[in-house]
Design a protein with these regions (language model features):
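Short beta-strand motif preference
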Residues: 77-79, 191, 305
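Canonical Radical SAM [4Fe-4S] cluster-binding loop centered on the CxxxCxxC motif
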Residues: 184-219
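Key residue(s) within conserved catalytic/signature motifs
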Residues: 11, 169-170, 202, 279
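A C-terminal junction/extension of Radical SAM enzymes
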Residues: 26-32, 46, 383-460
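Radical SAM enzyme core and accessory elements
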Residues: 1-146, 224, 440-511
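Beta-strand scaffold of nucleotide-dependent catalytic cores
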Residues: 192, 304, 373-377, 448, ...
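Conserved non-cysteine loop/helix-boundary elements of the Radical SAM core domain that shape
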Residues: 207-408
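N-terminal [4Fe-4S]-dependent radical SAM core
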Residues: 118-121, 141-189
Length: 511
């Protein structure tokens, strides 16, 4: 256990995130040595927030204790390793009125202290946010050269050379694609299908086993169509730039249900400005010829066939009820039916997977030659089975390193694919990232739009989250973003669909 004691609540979330990057296996608990009055009523950032008795409480069970004291324009940081009594201290001067600069200075000081004490560095430095390419994109939009952007990312965040080069390269490709999009007069549409054949061990997304909900799928589509009607009416004067049907696993729907849903979308919206219509077919065990034909005849331009790995033993461990041959056959079937923009998702850091296993997976993927490959770093959330039943998986190694990511990048390059979007998540194996690779002209527009947060995305369905991006930028060049979420529970979504629509009405009626 790691304990952090603050003399007042400030930047706890940032400190907590950085410590979890360095020490992912440790439980990080936050305490305050200030009076209860200074904490009461504040929106505290971390789950564990307790008061020390008198500011000098002993933490005998803690392996490490950090103390962070804010005094005027100075911050004192003290790090004690209880096992050997080693203590490291530092003090920095800040302009406390500039919160962004103060936060960055604190994180740099904390990072440098831990790096010196452990000899460990992080590939992304102090960056713990999920969208590191947004920073590189902002630098490019501000007219900074590659060298100036590199220096800024290195000095401000201590990111590694490899990650800086990756960010700059992706930001340039994103900008070229996004220049085609009318942010002010356009929007994108997400449709959520929350059903799955089964729940994977690593998954925390909102999903419901189809076997349990099979008799209510049409009720769900009835409610979804009602939300689609509202969206089409509200945005009739806007340009619809991209559509993404995700989940869950959309191909748990029957061919007739898929046809019903897509025809509803096509009848409700003007698609003349739509650059991309994606359906995440996803699980190979949910894909059939009839379902692919329903997608093809309705003009779907991009699909996913997601193996996650091509090692059967791993598929069995994580609860994927399909075989390696199922993946190959589903992919071949999609090609046979004329799909020319197919993505494949792979996950690094799965239980018991070695570098040779990854090489085997990439060899088989290379033989299939998909148009997109998305390399995910395993990020296990609290709601995932790998966490809830962690004792079952405690003896299994889950390793992801720069070597794994470099191997995948090399194979993608051999396939003629270039990195075009990137994002990170909390708790990623090896402190790595998710990277999307694509052939020329096959990049996923929706993926870039949702990461860069430059355009409103209207999301329909259980658990879907709508983001309204305001067109007028803030003084720092960022845009105000407001959100509303639909309830996750399928039964509640069906019963309360009118309330879900009212939430959207309130979000978009604000001036």
């Amino acid at each position: 256990m790691i304990v952090v004691v603050f003399n007042k609540p400030d930047f706890e979330y940032d400190v907590h995130s950085l410590l979890k990057e360095f020490f992912p296996q440790e439980d990080v608990q936050m305490y305050y040595s200030c009076s209860p009055d200074e904490v009461e009523g504040k929106n505290l950032a971390c789950t564990h927030h307790e008061m020390t008795d008198d500011g000098v409480k002993e933490f005998a069970d803690a392996s490490q204790v950090f103390k962070i004291d804010y005094v005027g324009d100075e911050i004192a940081v003290e790090w004690t390793l209880n096992r050997d009594g080693k203590r490291i201290c530092t003090k920095i001067s800040v302009d406390s009125a500039d919160r962004k600069e103060t936060k960055n200075s604190l994180k740099l000081a904390l990072y440098s202290m831990i790096e010196k004490g452990t000899g460990k560095s992080l590939p992304w430095g102090t960056l713990s946010g999920i969208r590191p390419t947004k920073i590189a994109m902002k630098c490019i939009e501000d007219g900074m050269s590659d060298k100036e952007t590199y220096d800024y990312l290195k000095e401000t965040y201590l990111a590694s050379d490899e990650k800086i080069d990756l960010s700059i390269g992706i930001a340039k490709r994103e900008k070229a694609l996004l220049d085609k999009v009318d942010y002010d007069n356009g929007y994108s549409l997400y449709i959520g299908i929350p059903f799955c054949p089964s729940t994977c061990a690593y998954c925390s997304f909102t999903s419901y086993p189809l076997g349990v909900w099979k008799n209510r799928v049409d009720d769900y589509l009835d409610a979804l169509e009602k939300e689609i009607d509202y969206t089409a009416q509200k945005f009739y004067h806007k340009k619809l730039n991209s559509i993404y049907i995700g989940g869950g696993t959309p191909t748990t729907l029957s061919p007739a249900q898929l046809d019903r849903l897509i025809r509803k979308i096509k009848c409700s919206f003007d698609l003349k400005d739509c650059l991309e219509f994606t359906v995440e077919a996803g699980r190979p065990d949910s894909i059939t010829r009839e379902k692919l034909m329903a997608l093809k005849k309705n003009g779907i331009s991009r699909i996913s066939v997601n193996p996650q790995t091509m090692k059967q033993q791993t598929l069995d461990i994580i609860g994927r009820h399909h075989t390696v041959d199922d993946t190959i056959n589903s992919f071949k079937l999609a090609r046979e039916l004329g799909f020319d923009n197919i993505n494949m998702d792979l996950i690094m850091g799965l239980p018991e997977e070695t570098l040779d296993d990854v090489r085997h997976t990439m060899e088989l993927v290379k033989e299939m030659a998909p148009d997109n490959v998305t390399i995910h770093s395993l990020a296990v959330k609290r709601a995932a089975r790998l966490t809830i039943f962690k004792d079952r998986y405690s003896d299994m190694q889950m390793v992801n390193t720069q070597e794994h990511m470099d191997l995948c990048a090399a194979y993608c390059k051999q396939m003629g694919l270039e990195p075009y979007y990137l994002y990170r998540q909390k708790g990623m194996a090896g402190n790595m990232e998710n990277v999307g690779y694509a052939a020329k002209g096959k990049a996923g527009v929706y993926n870039i739009l949702i990461m860069e947060e430059k355009q409103t995305i209207v999301a329909c369905g259980a658990g879907a989250s709508t983001k309204r991006v305001w067109p007028v930028p803030n003084p720092d060049g960022t845009h105000r973003i407001d959100r509303c979420e639909n309830v996750k529970d399928v039964g509640q979504y069906i019963a309360r669909i009118d309330e879900m629509i009212e939430r959207k009405q309130r979000l978009f009626e604000e001036k």
